[in-house]
C-alpha cells in the first residue's frame, strides 16, 4: 500500500473525453491509415476500374470501421438536461448546470457543466466514466466516486446504474450491451469473410456473408432497442427530468446493417439474374474466351449451375 494509493497528490487526475475514448481513437486511426494507404496506390490502377475500386474499398473499410468503433462509443443512448440542482452533499448551495448522460455497451459517461462554468468560486466542469466490463467492478467505481466527493448530480445518476439499485438499470443495460457486443463481433468476422469471398470465383458466398453481416449488426441494434420496451426508472435532477434517446452509434449501426443487407442482396440477385455482369463488375478484367464467342460462359462460382460448357479450341495455343 503506497502513499496516496500510488497517485501523485500535486497533479490533476486523468480526465476522460466525453463520448470519445482512446480505444475509439485508435480504431479510427487504424482504418484511416488503411484508407490512406489505398489512396496512395489508387493512381496505379488504370481505366474506369479505378473508381470502382475506390468505392468498393472505401465502402468496405467504412463498414468494418463502424462495426468495431461502436463497441467503444458511449453514444448508444444520450440524454441531456439543463437544470438548477443541489451541488454537493450536506450543502444548501445550488448551481445552474447542463447534465449529460451517455450510455454505451461498456458503461456510462456523465458530464456536469455549469452555465456559466464559474460558480460558487470554482469551476464546475466534471466528466466521469463508470464501466461494467467483465474485469471492471462498477460498484467499486461508484464507491470511489463517493470518497472523492463528486457533485450530487453525478452521484445521483451513477447510483441509478449500480447493481444494488432498485431501478434495475444496471442489469438491463449490462445484459443488452453484452449481447449487442457479441453479435457485433460476429458481424465483424463475417465482414472479413465477405471481403475474402468476394475476391474469389465464388461471389455468391461473399454476398451471403454480407447478408449475414447485416443481420448480426441489426441483431445488436435490436438487443439495445429491447430496453425501450421496458419502463425505466425516472431520472430527476432538481425540477427537471432527464430522458435518454437513441444516440449516433445506434443510428449509424442501424444504417450499416441495412447497407450490408442491400449490398449482399444485390450480389446474390445478380448472381442468379446476371452472373456474367457480376463477374465483370467484381473482376473488372477483360472478358474471357467464352464471352468473346458470344456463348454462355461457364460460371464456376455458382453452386447451382447445371450447364456444361465445351472448351473453346480457338483459345488454346500450343508452343511447338
From Swiss-Prot:
It is a multi-pass membrane protein. Glycans are attached at residues 84, 109, 121. The keyword Transmembrane helix applies. The keyword Transmembrane applies. N-glycosylated. Residues 1-21, 78-183, 228-247 are extracellular. It is found in: Endoplasmic reticulum membrane. Keywords: Congenital hypothyroidism, Disulfide bond, Endoplasmic reticulum, Glycoprotein, Membrane, Protein transport, Transmembrane, Transmembrane helix, Transport. Specifically expressed in thyroid. Also detected in salivary glands. GO terms for molecular function: enzyme binding. GO terms for biological process: hydrogen peroxide metabolic process; positive regulation of cell motility; positive regulation of hydrogen peroxide biosynthetic process; protein localization; protein maturation; protein transport; regulation of inflammatory response; regulation of thyroid hormone generation. Pfam families: DuoxA. One of its GO terms (cellular component) is endoplasmic reticulum. The chain crosses the membrane at residues 22-42, 57-77, 184-204, 207-227, 248-268. It comes from the Eukaryota. Residues 43-56, 205-206, 269-320 are cytoplasmic. Belongs to the DUOXA family. Heterodimer with DUXA2; disulfide-linked. Interacts with CSNK1G2. It is linked to Thyroid dyshormonogenesis 5: A disorder due to thyroid dyshormonogenesis, causing hypothyroidism, goiter, and variable mental deficits derived from unrecognized and untreated hypothyroidism. PANTHER family: DUAL OXIDASE 2, DUAL OXIDASE MATURATION FACTOR 2. Required for the maturation and the transport from the endoplasmic reticulum to the plasma membrane of functional DUOX2. May play a role in thyroid hormone synthesis. This is Dual oxidase maturation factor 2. It comes from Homo sapiens. The gene is DUOXA2.
Amino acid at each position: 500500500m503506497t502513499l496516496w494509493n500510488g497517485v501523485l497528490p500535486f497533479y490533476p487526475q486523468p480526465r476522460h473525453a466525453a463520448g470519445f475514448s482512446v480505444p475509439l481513437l485508435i480504431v479510427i486511426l487504424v482504418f484511416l491509415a488503411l484508407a490512406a494507404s489505398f489512396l496512395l496506390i489508387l493512381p496505379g490502377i488504370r481505366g474506369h476500374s479505378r473508381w470502382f475500386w475506390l468505392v468498393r474499398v472505401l465502402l468496405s473499410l467504412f463498414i468494418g470501421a463502424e462495426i468495431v468503433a461502436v463497441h467503444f462509443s458511449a453514444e448508444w443512448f444520450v440524454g441531456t438536461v439543463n437544470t438548477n440542482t443541489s451541488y454537493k452533499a450536506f450543502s444548501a448551495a445550488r448551481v445552474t448546470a447542463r447534465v449529460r448522460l451517455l450510455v454505451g455497451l461498456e458503461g456510462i459517461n456523465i458530464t456536469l457543466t455549469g452555465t456559466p462554468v464559474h460558480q460558487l468560486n470554482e469551476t464546475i466542469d466534471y466528466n466521469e466514466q463508470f464501466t461494467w466490463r467483465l474485469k471492471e467492478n462498477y460498484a467499486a467505481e461508484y464507491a470511489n466516486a463517493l470518497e472523492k466527493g463528486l457533485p450530487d448530480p453525478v452521484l445521483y445518476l451513477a447510483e441509478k446504474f449500480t447493481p444494488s439499485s432498485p431501478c434495475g438499470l444496471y442489469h438491463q443495460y449490462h445484459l443488452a450491451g453484452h449481447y449487442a457486443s457479441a453479435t457485433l463481433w460476429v458481424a465483424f468476422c463475417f465482414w472479413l469473410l465477405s471481403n475474402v469471398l468476394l475476391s474469389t470465383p465464388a461471389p455468391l458466398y461473399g454476398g451471403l456473408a454480407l447478408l449475414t453481416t447485416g443481420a448480426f449488426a441489426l441483431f445488436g441494434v435490436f438487443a439495445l432497442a429491447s430496453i425501450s420496451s421496458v419502463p425505466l426508472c425516472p431520472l430527476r435532477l432538481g425540477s427537471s427530468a432527464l430522458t435518454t434517446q437513441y444516440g449516433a452509434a445506434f443510428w449509424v449501426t442501424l444504417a450499416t446493417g441495412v447497407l450490408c443487407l442491400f449490398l449482399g442482396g444485390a450480389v446474390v440477385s445478380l448472381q442468379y439474374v446476371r452472373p456474367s455482369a457480376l463477374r465483370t463488375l467484381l473482376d473488372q478484367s477483360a472478358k474471357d474466351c467464352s464471352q468473346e464467342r458470344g456463348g454462355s460462359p461457364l460460371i464456376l462460382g455458382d453452386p447451382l449451375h447445371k450447364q456444361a460448357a465445351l472448351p473453346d479450341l480457338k483459345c488454346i495455343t500450343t508452343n511447338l
